[in-house]
Every structure is written in C-alpha cells, then in structure tokens.
C-alpha cells in the first residue's frame, strides 16, 4: 500500500468558476468542515476553494462536497498522488492565474498555521501540507518563476498605475494579512506616499511604517470619502464595503478579498481578480521557460513524499507503543522506589526500543506492507486496538 493514496482533494478554482461564484462557495465549505472530526485542510483564496482530507469515509467526502453548493457538479475530485501533485502545484504557483505568484504561498502558510492550532490539520495530512509549503519555497528559490510581478497584488497595482498617478494619490489598504502587507510594501515601492492602512488590530500593522486606523464602519467610510484608491484584502464572509457615500473621492476600489469584500453594484470601478486576467496572461507567457523547471521539482518532491509519509506513519504508531510501554515502566518504577526509579525505567524503555523504531522506519521505506505486518503483530500482542 502507498500511504499517499489516502489523500483526497476537492477543488473549485478560477478555472471552473469566476471570482464572484467562488466567493459564494467559501462560506458553505467552511460551514460543513468545522463540524467534522476527520483530519482536513481548507484553502480558500481569490482563485480557489479547496478541501484536503486523509483517509475519509465516502460519506465524509459527500458532506464536504455538499458545502460547494450550488456548484457541486463542477467540483474536481483528485485522489492519491494526483491530489498531492495538485497541492504541490498550488504551493508552487503553477495553478495560479498569475503563474509563480507568491501570495498563494503566504496564504497557504497562514491557513496551515491556523488550522494546525485549531486541531483540524493533523497526522499524515499535516505532513503533506508541510511538504507542499517546502515545495513552494524550493520552486521560488531554484527557478525564476516569480520574477516580475510577484502576485495578484502586484498586478492590481500595475493596473491602477495605468489610470492613476500613485505618487500623488491618496491610497488606503484595508486588511494587513499576508496579501495586505504585500500590497503596502509594493505600493511604497511603486511611489505611493500618502498611504493609510486599516486593520482589525492596529498593533499587528504597526511595523509597516505607515499610519494605521482600526477597522470600523466609520474608518471604511472615511477611506471612501477621502482616498483616491482603496484596496481591500480582508478575510470575512460579509462585504465590508456595502455602499459608497455621495460625493466620495474614491475612483477605484481593488477587491482582493476572499470572499468578496465589496457588494455588487457600487457606483465606482471595482477591480477584481477577473479584471486582471489579460494582464496575467501577458506575464505568464514570459514565464514559460521556468514552468518546466518548477514541474520537475514538483515531481521530485512527490517521490520523496511517499518515503516521508512512511517514516511519519511509523513515528505516529511508535509513539502510541512507547506510551503503552512507558506506562508499564512507570508502574514498575513506582513499585521499585518512586520518582528516580520511574525516570530510570522510562530511560530504559527509550534506549531499548529506539532500535526497534529505527528498524521499523527502514522496513517501512522499502516495504510498507511488511512494516504494517510487524506493527499488526505488536498491536495484537499487546491488545492495542487504536494502532
């Protein structure tokens, strides 16, 4: 058996739906996933809403799919190495509208950290996502795929510069997550000097070196009233810009939020990811030579992934065995003389069983079925049902 075969990916991306439709899907996917006990990882950006699971029962897959309503029939399901390949390609920027963009890697890391802390992304699925992040970093280090505009934020700034002189414009960025922070830095590089950031936490945006306002309905209204360009990059399921005040100064709103940060029908130009497709295509054509190099790295890492999963699997199983043996050792140590004897007993268990664990890792790398057989014998011998 190959452990990567347990991976399942459910995806809707910019290739299947427009940004507005993707925006509607994200809330439903999160809603059905939060109640699941299955290890899972959800990634939603401007360009994608994806759920990754490991060894899920068929009914769990169907539950997650239901969250994609009303676009369930468009969901792309991948399994095993195809699912891992897709995640690696996403991390590498190969599946982005702007090939090689860096925003997606930051969003992937943020989502991973958040979901690991919450206990959703765990066990072997955690290993897969960790490896994807490594692949994304390696591709950008070893290839030139990210030269030029580094993300959709960069593209949006280029788009705005064709219409407005940023050196004289008043610019507001709402949101200081990975996308918002990137926008601020690139706007400064592009010549924007009259720049304000609006964020839920003023402290978290203080290091950006610009004026920061706390996020509120009034601060958003002030941005629209007093600024020429407003960028939004806030993680929220409700629009933060629902209307534009009469006689507002704003000329362009750039909505980088996922889901959408702006309501439909605003009386000013709203730039979304869909607005940037033609510009992205131009730069993608310039990156063709680097795509093959990036794809070769992805394939190398897929081979390494199975080996890593086998080692991690042995470590997880061994941890449960060690816990069982430690418990016995501590009980015997307690009988023999208290704390010092307990510590000595634990140390003896570690020293005695470490060679067994290392041997199991070697066996698993070369023959996972044999490793599983050995562990099954241990499980039956000690009456451990949850190995």
Curated annotation (Swiss-Prot):
<keyword id="KW-0560">Oxidoreductase</keyword>
<feature type="binding site">
    <location>
        <begin position="175"/>
        <end position="180"/>
    </location>
    <ligand>
        <name>NADP(+)</name>
    </ligand>
</feature>
<dbReference type="InterPro" id="IPR036343">
    <property type="entry name" value="GluRdtase_N_sf"/>
</dbReference>
<dbReference type="Pfam" id="PF01488">
    <property type="entry name" value="Shikimate_DH"/>
</dbReference>
<comment type="similarity">
    <text>Belongs to the glutamyl-tRNA reductase family.</text>
</comment>
<dbReference type="GO" id="GO:0019353">
    <property type="term" value="P:protoporphyrinogen IX biosynthetic process from glutamate"/>
</dbReference>
<protein>
    <recommendedName>
        <fullName>Glutamyl-tRNA reductase 1</fullName>
        <ecNumber>1.2.1.70</ecNumber>
    </recommendedName>
</protein>
<feature type="binding site">
    <location>
        <position position="96"/>
    </location>
    <ligand>
        <name>substrate</name>
    </ligand>
</feature>
<dbReference type="GO" id="GO:0050661">
    <property type="term" value="F:NADP binding"/>
</dbReference>
<feature type="binding site">
    <location>
        <begin position="101"/>
        <end position="103"/>
    </location>
    <ligand>
        <name>substrate</name>
    </ligand>
</feature>
<feature type="binding site">
    <location>
        <begin position="45"/>
        <end position="48"/>
    </location>
    <ligand>
        <name>substrate</name>
    </ligand>
</feature>
<dbReference type="InterPro" id="IPR000343">
    <property type="entry name" value="4pyrrol_synth_GluRdtase"/>
</dbReference>
<dbReference type="Pfam" id="PF05201">
    <property type="entry name" value="GlutR_N"/>
</dbReference>
<feature type="active site" description="Nucleophile">
    <location>
        <position position="46"/>
    </location>
</feature>
<comment type="pathway">
    <text>Porphyrin-containing compound metabolism; protoporphyrin-IX biosynthesis; 5-aminolevulinate from L-glutamyl-tRNA(Glu): step 1/2.</text>
</comment>
<keyword id="KW-0521">NADP</keyword>
<dbReference type="InterPro" id="IPR018214">
    <property type="entry name" value="GluRdtase_CS"/>
</dbReference>
<dbReference type="GO" id="GO:0008883">
    <property type="term" value="F:glutamyl-tRNA reductase activity"/>
</dbReference>
<comment type="subunit">
    <text>Homodimer.</text>
</comment>
<dbReference type="InterPro" id="IPR006151">
    <property type="entry name" value="Shikm_DH/Glu-tRNA_Rdtase"/>
</dbReference>
<keyword id="KW-0627">Porphyrin biosynthesis</keyword>
<dbReference type="InterPro" id="IPR015895">
    <property type="entry name" value="4pyrrol_synth_GluRdtase_N"/>
</dbReference>
<comment type="function">
    <text>Catalyzes the NADPH-dependent reduction of glutamyl-tRNA(Glu) to glutamate 1-semialdehyde (GSA).</text>
</comment>
<feature type="binding site">
    <location>
        <position position="107"/>
    </location>
    <ligand>
        <name>substrate</name>
    </ligand>
</feature>
<dbReference type="InterPro" id="IPR036291">
    <property type="entry name" value="NAD(P)-bd_dom_sf"/>
</dbReference>
<feature type="site" description="Important for activity">
    <location>
        <position position="86"/>
    </location>
</feature>
